[in-house]
Amino acid sequence: YKDKEELKAEISKGFEKYIAEFDSIPEALKDIRVAEVDRTPAENLAYQIGWTTLLLKWENDEKRGVEVKTPSELFRWNQLGDLYQWFTDTYSHSSLVELKDQLKGNVTSIQTMIDSMSEEELFQPHMRKWADDATKTAVWEVYKFIHVNTVAPFGTFRTKIRKWKKATL
């Protein structure tokens, strides 16, 4: 990304394409599992809500001077399967409308978070302790964490929900 505006534009573009896929899914089918896809529509959204919520929490906690535990206080990086199940248990019981609204709110908050940061804070290494602590060997700038929790999964999970729709609708 050349700057924060390009990052924000890619997040918006990816999110709008991703979230639109859910408009044609009836509420009654939100928990239907198909063999071809690893997540139901509700689980698909719960995963996105979970990661975007954590991303916002990492930044907010550091700003408040709270020690950040990545990926969360409850789980370590070698427990991602359990974390994903926690996302499902925590969020997927909500309606599709509620899930979409919650994710939209998180994406809006991430855009605001980006606006509040300087280009240096976003694109230079070692600008956030939580970003440094989250990776043992690699050096990740904050924008990479934003990308892998927004733009990247919005693309891959859009493919998954399209596959689910093809098998179900």
What are the residue ranges of the model-derived segments?
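Extreme N-terminal tail/first-helix region
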Residues: 1-17
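Charged, low-complexity, helix/coiled-coil-prone segments
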Residues: 1-4, 41-58, 96-106
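Active-site rim elements
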Residues: 2-7, 89, 93-100, 143-147
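Structural signal for well-ordered, non-membrane alpha-helices
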Residues: 15-26, 52-56, 60, 104-118, ...
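Short, flexible helix-adjacent loops and helix caps
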Residues: 23-30, 34, 122
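Short, contiguous alpha-helical
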Residues: 31-82, 125-169
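Acidic/histidine-rich alpha-helical segments that form the ligand environment
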Residues: 79-124
